[in-house]
Amino acid sequence: MALTPESPSSFPGLAAIGSSVPEPPGSPNATLNSSWASPTEPSSLEDLVATGAIGTLLSAMGVVGVVGNAYTLVVTCRSLRAVASMYIYVVNLALADLLYLLSIPFIVATYITKEWHFGDVGCRVLFSLDFLTMHASIFTLTVMSSERYAAVLRPLDTVQRPKGYRKLLALGTWLLALLLTLPVMLAMRLVRRGPKSLCLPAWGPRAHRAYLTLLFATSIAGPGLLIGLLYARLARAYRRSQRASFKRARRPGARALRLVLGIVLLFWACFLPFWLWQLLAQYREAPLAPRTARIVNYLTTCLTYGNSCANPFLYTLLTRNYRDHLRGRVRSPGSGGVRGPVPSLQPRARFQRGSGRSLSSCSPQPTESLVLAAAAPAGPALESPGDPA
């Protein structure tokens, strides 16, 4: 969805309900309405085909995505809740995707009828739900990336944290996302324009542009820079480990890192075009041709919903990584699931050799950690007493 009332790159529901009432060039929805043929005029065959295609595609994405995310929620809560301390983040991601996908029926209905049928409350809820779930997803991914970074490079810090801190972080991501969404939730209103209804914010074009720019910074630019920095440092640590002269064990945490990074990259691939389109519409003076604007709006809309549709496949791989690792710990004889020597900083390795057990056994929370059993000659820790995913 998009929220650009002064441009044709608008939220699909908004683009579908433009009014035929003439408006002055500076009005918020003047260029918006120009992106569609007047609702009083018969639709062309091309419009009918495009509407049918986009409606069918979004409906298919909705069915696949809802089933996939519901399956992820069930599997994660049943299989990992008692043993995997990071399960709450997977639940967060799947829940955000599920809520976002549940808006598809409203969007398809608006595309087909070119009329808003869901009242003032629908305007506020559906527009704000879009930004709420988007921010909840990227904030959760940022927290997960930070956790992986800390588990690999600062393992002792992870075992000293209280048991419920991850639940507090998960709740915090939703509260912060809600805080950023409140302005649009309060400002959206249903406005009558002739025979049609239109969802518009109460603020002016400048405030709207500033708000969208802020949301771009909080959902793409800021988290992107932070996650990029974390993974750059992790990549450097792994490169250093490749030069270390000791036998390395198989590290399930490396696979988990790649899966989390894959989810992050998929988010960027699907939402960056959407945001570039939104900002282009805000800062570009000359509007695109209505047909071009409509096509771009279709494509960016499908990309954002496609992200929530594809994510469950990566979530399944992530939870499977948890289960495989836990199964390996149970089957491993002897010292609590030790699978081989894993590099660490030398002082930490000496501590473990003296104690004869994993540092994670001192943690008050259940974890899925490996034992750091051998000292590296140099370089940062590459496995941690943290979780494998």
Curated annotation (Swiss-Prot):
Positions of region (Disordered): 1-39, 328-366
One Pfam assignment: 7tm_1
Segments on the Cytoplasmic face: 78-87, 147-167, 233-258, 319-389
Extracellular side: 1-54, 114-124, 187-209, 285-297
GO molecular function: urotensin II receptor activity
Intrachain disulfide bonds: 123-199
Keyword flag Glycoprotein: yes
Subcellular location: Cell membrane
Source organism per UniProt: Macaca mulatta (Rhesus macaque)
Gene Ontology annotations of biological process type: blood vessel diameter maintenance; neuropeptide signaling pathway; regulation of blood pressure
Gene Ontology cellular-component terms listed: plasma membrane
Compositional bias annotation for Polar residues: 1-10, 28-39, 355-366
Database matches in InterPro entries: GPCR_Rhodpsn, GPCR_Rhodpsn_7TM, Urot_II_rcpt
Function: High affinity receptor for urotensin-2 and urotensin-2B. The activity of this receptor is mediated by a G-protein that activate a phosphatidylinositol-calcium second messenger system.
Recorded superkingdom: Eukaryota
Sites carrying sugar chains: 29, 33
TM spans (from-to): 55-77, 88-113, 125-146, 168-186, 210-232, 259-284, 298-318
Main location class: membrane
Family affiliation: Belongs to the G-protein coupled receptor 1 family.
UniProt xrefs under CDD domains: 7tmA_UII-R
Topology term for the membrane: Multi-pass membrane protein
Keywords from the named record: Cell membrane, Disulfide bond, G-protein coupled receptor, Glycoprotein, Membrane, Receptor, Transducer, Transmembrane, Transmembrane helix
Protein name (database record): Urotensin-2 receptor
